[in-house]
UniProtKB/Swiss-Prot annotation:
Signal peptide: none annotated. Belongs to the CobS family. Joins adenosylcobinamide-GDP and alpha-ribazole to generate adenosylcobalamin (Ado-cobalamin). Also synthesizes adenosylcobalamin 5'-phosphate from adenosylcobinamide-GDP and alpha-ribazole 5'-phosphate. It is an enzyme of class 2 (transferase). The chain crosses the membrane at residues 44-64, 114-134, 143-163, 177-197, 198-218. GO terms for molecular function: adenosylcobinamide-GDP ribazoletransferase activity; cobalamin 5'-phosphate synthase activity. This is Adenosylcobinamide-GDP ribazoletransferase. One of its GO terms (biological process) is cobalamin biosynthetic process. Pathway: Cofactor biosynthesis; adenosylcobalamin biosynthesis; adenosylcobalamin from cob(II)yrinate a,c-diamide: step 7/7.
Length: 251
């Protein structure tokens, strides 16, 4: 009976996380404790998103047209995630690119309007994703397209574990609360196992360096500004995804 209750709770946490991070499950109301518990499932949500977005091309859709496949993959990821993480990426590029600090940094970060640095970040980020995906497909290692969202979401959990949430963001607080040592170890294990299976051990090792650099940079920036919010987490997911694709090419 206890096992059944545990499995039911974990299933609910997975569904809640899927609905929060993607449109692949219905969005549902959740308590703070449920949101925190769902953090452990972020890499699994990434795996589901990767399968949905890369699966058609792995099965041969648009075979022989790697540029179109790469663009389709990026477009499907945008659709599946509602552009949620790219929004955080753009906001962070605006705030960081302005060289602002303190309250001014947070004012820019939370401004719903996009600035020049945000536009540049989106253009070069999406362009980079398409180019890297094209190279991965051309190398015949398209399994890495499935793995990239896994690494991105695991990186987000590591970032949340490294930075005190501060008082500026409910999402930052809840994610940090869920990013316990055991959760980080579980996410790392899931990410390593899926990476070895889908991209190969050399790609996992090669992706670790740029991903670690991204987490270290975001950690330093968040600590300087007194905490993190959802924009930091979204930007970390994007950087983790790009790191997975880059690592696969370099391996």
């Amino acid at each position: 009976m206890k096992l059944a209750s545990l499995l039911a709770a974990q299933w609910r946490a997975l569904v809640l996380s899927t609905g929060f991070l993607t449109r692949l499950a219905p969005a549902r109301a959740a308590t703070d404790a449920e949101m925190a518990a769902g953090v452990a499932h972020y890499p699994l949500v990434g795996l589901l998103a990767g399968l949905v977005c890369a699966g058609p091309f792995l099965l041969g859709l648009l075979a022989g047209h790697p540029w179109v496949q790469a663009l389709g993959y990026a477009a499907l990821l945008l659709w599946a995630t509602r552009g949620l993480h790219w929004d955080g990426w753009a906001d962070l590029m605006d705030a960081w690119g302005s060289s602002a600090t303190g309250d001014r940094f947070w004012d820019i970060l939370k401004d719903s309007r996009i600035g020049a640095f945000g536009v540049l970040g989106i253009v070069f980020g999406v362009l980079g994703q398409v180019v890297l995906a094209h190279e991965v497909i051309t190398l015949g290692r398209a399994g890495a397209l499935v793995w990239a969202p896994v690494l991105g979401r695991a990186a987000c959990v590591v970032l949340a574990a490294c930075v005190p949430p501060g008082t500026r963001s409910t999402l930052g607080r809840l994610t940090s609360a869920g990013a316990t040592h055991m959760t980080v170890l579980f996410c790392a294990g899931v990410t390593a196992a899926t990476g070895v299976a889908l991209a190969g051990p050399p790609a996992v090792l090669a992706a670790a360096l740029p991903c670690a650099c991204a987490v270290v940079w975001l950690t330093a920036l968040a600590r300087r500004e007194g905490g993190l919010n959802g924009d930091f987490l979204g930007a970390c997911i994007i950087q983790g995804e790009l790191s997975a694709l880059l690592g696969t090419i370099l391996a």
